[in-house]
Amino acid sequence: MTIDNSKKTSFGFRQVNEKDKAEMVGDVFDSVADNYDLMNDLMSFGIHRLWKKITVETAGLREDFKILDLAGGTGDMVKLMRSKISNQGSIILSDINWSMLHEGRNRLIDEGIEDVQMAQIDAQYLPFKENTFDLITIAFGLRNVTNKKTALELSLTHI
């Protein structure tokens, strides 16, 4: 009998090895990127849009904010936040999954929002200097991060 000493983390309703989760999550989002918002609408009866709107309205955004949206996927949070900041501010849409980031970029461009930077990054490994941002958001993407504590602690060092 072999003993599995690898660290476990949640993936849906089951526990998986931490080292396997990122690839599993990637496979899921590669397959759903173009229908992701529709899936969220169906699963939450559209309430996710209200939650995101309330989040943006209560975030205390200023015109000059520098914002990083982690696990930003299709860009719906970025779209809401972009209207609240001026050209003095900036937003980076980021996601670990290229398919989601590509979908987000296309949707933002279709909406006439072309001044948002894009970055394919993992929320657990931020490639920015500390204290770079005024606000870091991560909507529902936190559920897909392998080590949530690491990602949240790291985010705090970058605000």
Segment roles from a protein language model:
Residues 140-143:
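Short catalytic micro-motifs in class I SAM-dependent methyltransferases
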Residues 145-154:
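A short, conserved alpha-helix within the catalytic core of class I
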Residues 66-126:
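Class I SAM-dependent methyltransferase SAM/SAH-binding core
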Residues 1-26:
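N-terminal auxiliary segments of SAM/dcSAM-dependent transferases
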Residues 35-38, 45-65, 80:
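Conserved alpha-helix/loop element of class I SAM-dependent methyltransferases that forms part
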Residues 157-159:
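Conserved small/polar residues in nucleotide/adenosyl-binding loops
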